[in-house]
UniProtKB/Swiss-Prot annotation:
GO biological process: apoptotic signaling pathway; B cell activation; B cell proliferation; cellular response to lipopolysaccharide; cellular response to oxidised low-density lipoprotein particle stimulus; defense response to virus; inflammatory response; innate immune response
Name listed for the protein in its UniProt record: TIR domain-containing adapter molecule 1
Domain-level remarks: The pLxIS motif constitutes an IRF3-binding motif: following phosphorylation by TBK1, the phosphorylated pLxIS motif of TICAM1 recruits IRF3. IRF3 is then phosphorylated and activated by TBK1 to induce type-I interferons and other cytokines. The N-terminal region is essential for activation of the IFNB promoter activity.
Organism: Mus musculus
Subunit structure, interactors included: Homodimer. Found in a multi-helicase-TICAM1 complex at least composed of DHX36, DDX1, DDX21 and TICAM1; this complex exists in resting cells with or without poly(I:C) RNA ligand stimulation. Interacts (via TIR domain) with DDX21 (via C-terminus). Interacts (via TIR domain) with DHX36 (via C-terminus). Interacts with AZI2 and IRF7. Interacts (when phosphorylated) with IRF3; following activation and phosphorylation on the pLxIS motif by TBK1, recruits IRF3. Interacts with TICAM2 in TLR4 recruitment. Interaction with PIAS4 inhibits the TICAM1-induced NF-kappa-B, IRF and IFNB1 activation.
One MF term in the entry's GO annotations: protein kinase binding
Region span, Disordered: 144-191, 305-389, 603-679, 696-732
Free-text function comment from the UniProt entry: Involved in innate immunity against invading pathogens. Adapter used by TLR3, TLR4 (through TICAM2) and TLR5 to mediate NF-kappa-B and interferon-regulatory factor (IRF) activation, and to induce apoptosis. Ligand binding to these receptors results in TRIF recruitment through its TIR domain. Distinct protein-interaction motifs allow recruitment of the effector proteins TBK1, TRAF6 and RIPK1, which in turn, lead to the activation of transcription factors IRF3 and IRF7, NF-kappa-B and FADD respectively.
SUPFAM superfamilies: Toll/Interleukin receptor TIR domain (SSF52200)
Length: 732
């Protein structure tokens, strides 16, 4: 079916395509609005006409005598005699737009159709020059999407908008301009950007014109020269110091983000030499030149929105607490310098040295275990806990009709009749809750949980085992659940009598007052049963139950996450304990290895290879040296020069009575182990020959038995030298 477009006939076409139950629901919803707008009352009358209830529609249209569009509807669709002719009123397009807005709120038409209706209304009012065009524009701005927000021709002049300005309490010193209509005779509508014959680049040739309704809000702080495209020299500008607590208005001609990056990258203290205006142009560099502004009307901004602050602003504030700031306003880069502008906008802002800390190596598990703050953070949940309104698509119904499988048509009729009698938002078990593929008992529980009243449709078919279980389940739920008392209502329809019911069903429900459709006061009983206060109380109870269920699910998920974190923490603690045990074992092995080195024979040494470091005498941890570095200028080893006399020195034995002999141990007892190289001890030798540097010494002689003992007690050879040779002890 073709869409007739946004008109009264199109609105009637939308209503005519709806189902009857949907129209009935919309009729009750619009009729319950006591203080509704004129358009909602007109839409209510149109719904009555779509339902075929012409009498009620005429009564509703009669109450809208002052509405010209309502009179047009009454003349064309309700066959009512009106004083006015069938011509269309001037505000017809606006009323049609409001009607489509109500239909879009009920999801009866797409939002694009509503926007099209407002576009037609804006075009009509603009062509007529109606004084209500501004009010219509504001309404379209609030209700429509961003596609048509603006002038109907596609452009809109600049004007002061009170909604975009901050309240006067934010900055009492700032002046405001009063809004006024555009009265400039030479004002022209805006047009798209287009290239000109100028050789200047587009980036430096863009200009911002002055608004005809908004005057300059602040004065200039310095002398702004013309553009660099002109040949006139620029005047010297000195950066003005601003207190830290104040905020100075900045120009719009330079993007705030780029200006912030330049201020971070340049030094904080910049001295500008004072020169004459004639020498300012050739002396001043491009980086310190004053920013170029438009020749026509430079516009300054007096306030900065707190919501539109870039991330660099917070970084600058944190750095400003550590660095002394001498100037709140950094030197600006001229717009005409394309190369410097591209470099500045593309390069990231320079960070202060305090923020560029060198990365550190991660701590070892032992050091991490010593500080509680270094434990790993608990893993974040991959499935975040959402609100119940986002996870559940169930809605609340004022009543639900529980019925047998053979009574679906009767249940639908009962629901429509109850809605006609003023009980909105009803449902049937087969229509809303009996989802294919789901368990029957689960569907029954959902129907009871998500409804205020449970209506049991008593027919001859309602006598099977499943129906009896439904009765028992509904009764037990009303008795055990808080706030569910008197919520189970047996209903006897016109299609059945009490004699046709099963004895079991009658026995279970004999203690409850029934709702009999055969009764002449059936409508009054329905009104007394389903009161607005009761329905509202049931809705509040349902919301609380859903919130409690959501909180319970969240608590279960959080408990599972807590157990997961506890398991990870226990595993980490066990790992730390095993690491400490392994480290203690390594320490023991190191001590034993050091002892074995101290008990071994000395190894010869040569230049560039140091002796192995023995362990500590008390059994401490051995310290292993690093590998020696090769010397830059190796020196040959120094050997002792032989004596000048040809005969080797004699070895006189000390007398037996000498007190020094008591300090040497006996030959039978082993020498004590000391750290370092051990002395060379020779026993029972008659001749000893030593050779150093191709020289040989010898000593022979017979010794008495007493001398032999004395010789065994006195060591003949001393400890090894640094070159690994035995040291000969000579008498003094």
């Amino acid at each position: 079916m073709d869409n007739p477009g946004p008109s009264l006939r199109g609105a009637f076409g939308i209503l005519g395509a709806l189902e009857r139950d949907r129209l009935t629901h919309l009729k009750h919803k619009l009729g319950s609005l006591c203080s509704g707008s004129q358009e909602s009352k007109l839409l209510h009358a149109m719904v009555l006409l779509a339902l075929g209830q012409d009498t009620e529609a005429r009564v509703s249209l009669e109450s809208l005598k002052m509405n010209t569009v309502a009179q047009l509807v009454a003349h064309q669709w309700a066959d009512m005699e009106t004083t006015e002719g069938p011509e269309e009123p001037p505000d017809l397009s606006w009323t049609v737009a409001r009607l489509y807005h109500l239909l879009a709120e009920e999801n009866l038409c797409p939002a694009s159709t509503r926007d099209m209706a407002y576009q037609v209304a804006l075009r009509d009012f603009a062509s007529q020059g109606d004084h209500q065009l501004g009010q219509l524009q504001n309404e379209a701005w609030d209700r429509c999407s961003s596609d048509i927000k603006g002038d109907p021709s596609g452009f809109q002049p600049l004007h002061s908008h009170q909604g975009s300005l901050q309240p006067p309490s934010a900055s009492p010193a700032v002046t405001r301009s009063q809004p006024r209509p555009i009265d400039t005779p030479d004002w022209s509508w805006g047009h798209t950007l287009h290239s000109t014959n100028s050789t200047a680049s587009l980036a430096s040739h863009l200009e911002i014109s002055q608004s005809p309704t908004l005057a300059f809000l602040s004065s200039h702080h310095g002398t702004h020269g013309p553009s660099k495209l002109c040949n006139t020299p620029l005047d010297t500008q000195e950066p003005q110091l601003v207190p830290e607590g104040c905020q100075e208005p900045e120009e719009i001609s330079w993007p705030p983000s780029v200006e912030t990056s330049v201020s971070l990258g340049l030094p904080h203290e910049i001295s500008v030499p004072e020169v004459s205006p004639e020498e300012a142009s050739p002396i001043l560099p491009d980086a310190l030149a004053a920013p170029d502004t438009s020749v026509h009307c430079p516009i300054e901004c007096t306030e900065l929105s707190t919501n539109s602050r870039s991330p660099l602003t917070s970084t600058t504030e944190s750095v400003g607490k550590q660095w002394p700031i001498t100037s709140q306003r950094s030197p600006q880069v001229p717009v005409g310098d394309d190369s410097l502008q591209n470099t500045t906008s593309s390069s990231p802002p320079a960070q202060p040295p305090s923020l560029q800390a060198s990365p550190k190596l991660p701590p070892s598990p032992l050091s991490s275990a010593s500080s509680p703050s270094s434990y790993p953070a608990p893993p974040t949940s991959t499935s975040p806990v959402l609100d119940h309104s986002e996870t559940s698509d169930q809605k609340f119904y004022n009543f639900v009709v529980i019925h047998a499988r053979a009574d679906e048509q009767v249940a639908l009729r009962i629901r429509e009749k109850l809605e006609t009698l003023g009980v909105p938002d009803g449902a049937t078990f087969c229509e809303e809750f009996q989802v294919p593929g789901r368990g029957e008992l689960h569907c029954l529980q959902d129907a009871i949980d998500h409804s205020g009243f449970t209506i049991l449709l008593l027919t001859a078919s309602f006598d099977c085992s499943l129906s009896l279980h439904q009765i028992n389940h509904a009764l037990m739920n009303s008795l055990t659940q808080s706030g569910r008392q008197d919520c189970v209502i047996p209903l006897l329809p016109l299609e059945c009598s009490q004699a046709q019911l099963s004895p079991d069903t009658t026995r279970l429900l004999h203690s409850i007052v029934w709702l009999d459709e055969h009764s002449p006061i059936f409508a009054r009983k329905v009104a007394n049963t389903f009161k607005t206060q009761k329905l509202q109380a049931q809705r509040v109870r349902w919301k609380k139950a859903q919130e409690a269920r959501t909180l319970k699910e969240q608590s279960i998920q959080l408990e599972a996450e807590r157990q997961n974190v506890a398991a990870i923490s226990a595993a980490y603690t066990a790992y730390v304990h095993s690491y400490r045990a392994w480290q203690a074992e390594m320490n023991k092995l190191g001590v034993a290895f050091g002892k074995n080195l101290s008990l071994g024979t000395p190894t010869p040494s040569w230049p560039g290879c140091p002796q192995p470091i023995p362990s500590h005498p008390q059994g401490g941890t051995p310290v292993f040296p690093y590998s020696p570095q090769p010397p830059s200028f190796p020196q040959p080893p120094c050997f002792p020069q032989p004596p000048s006399f040809p005969q080797p020195p004699s070895f006189p034995l000390p007398p037996v009575s000498s007190p020094q002999s008591q300090s040497f141990p006996s030959a039978s007892s082993p020498a004590p182990q000391t750290p370092g190289p051990q002395p060379l001890i020779i026993h029972h030798a008659q001749m000893v020959q030593l050779g150093v540097n191709n020289h040989m010494w010898g000593h022979t002689g017979a010794q008495s038995s007493d001398d032999k003992t004395e010789c065994s007690e006195n060591p003949c050879m001393g400890p090894l030298t640094d070159q690994g040779e035995p040291l000969l002890e000579t008498p003094e």
